[in-house]
Amino acid sequence: METNCRKLVSACVQLGVQPAAVECLFSKDSEIKKVEFTDSPKSRKESASSKLFPRQHPGANEKDKGQQGKNEDVGAEDPSKKKRQRRQRTHFTSQQLQELEATFQRNRYPDMSTREEIAVWTNLTEARVRVWFKNRRAKWRKRERNQQAELCKNGFGPQFNGLMQPYDDMYPGYSYNNWAAKGLTSASLSTKSFPFFNSMNVNPLSSQSMFSPPNSISSMSMSSSMVPSAVTGVPGSSLNSLNNLNNLSSPSLNSAVPTPACPYAPPTPPYVYRDTCNSSLASLRLKAKQHSSFGYASVQNPASNLSACQYAVDRPV
């Protein structure tokens, strides 16, 4: 059968006839077992299918599968090649770290030549030294930021919390630009709450005692009341003027200026006003002695009933 098919195929080729199975005969001559040269529908379908899906050698399929497997292996290896290999960590010795830290304390931004010198001293590469300085600067900046944050957080004590409150929280009873309508009286101020003074246990009005002068004039009045008993020859107009000054000043000062003790310090020592008062009394006594020595103690001044201002105006120039 196979010999007959081969003879028929050779004859058809010589005559120029190309049957439907010629391609199969030329491609795989030894494997053809049955050849149909009829024009039956079955043969036509088989010829069409053979053109669309030509037969392949089973060894070729195995070769193709092997090539596909190799391509897959190459594709699997490509991402690993593209993936950046992890660099090994550099383990510094204590001597190297000591040298690097000493240089960092002197210069935080060394140039290329300095880095090369450090690399020679520490037996490292310039790239390793550059990376170490970069990481060390980042650590230093982070520590500086943390220290500044701690200072800002703990810089103000609790006694200053009252000063940090808003205006509305400190003075809830007062509206904007309404001071004239309510009036700034001592009663209105005493009823308001001041967080800063409350935290320090201080009355707001008691702060006036820290800035108000002492009752030097009242002490002057007490000392001046003793002058007539000691001085006899002094003109009466000056004594009357002192008494008038005491009568005018002492009630107003005693009613206006409170005298609570300062909570921060012991009672203050006498002011200079008392010293001047004592010096004036000493001068008055000295003048009295001079008048008594010259015999003017019995002389009466005709203008003794005048006030201090009238006496100053009527004096002859």
Swiss-Prot record:
Pfam families, per database record: Homeodomain, OAR
The record's principal subcellular location, in a coarse class, is nucleus
Matching InterPro entries: HD, Homeobox_CS, Homeobox_Pitx/unc30, Homeodomain-like_sf, OAR_dom
Region feature Disordered, mapped onto this chain:
35-99
Q: What induces it?
A: Expression is activated by CITED2 and TFAP2A and TFAP2C.
**Motif range for OAR?**
279-292
Q: Where is the composition biased (Basic and acidic residues)?
A: 35-48, 60-73
Q: Which residues bind DNA?
A: 85-144
Q: Which PANTHER family match?
A: PITUITARY HOMEOBOX 2, PITUITARY HOMEOBOX HOMOLOG PTX1
Q: What is this protein called?
A: Pituitary homeobox 2
The coding gene here is Pitx2
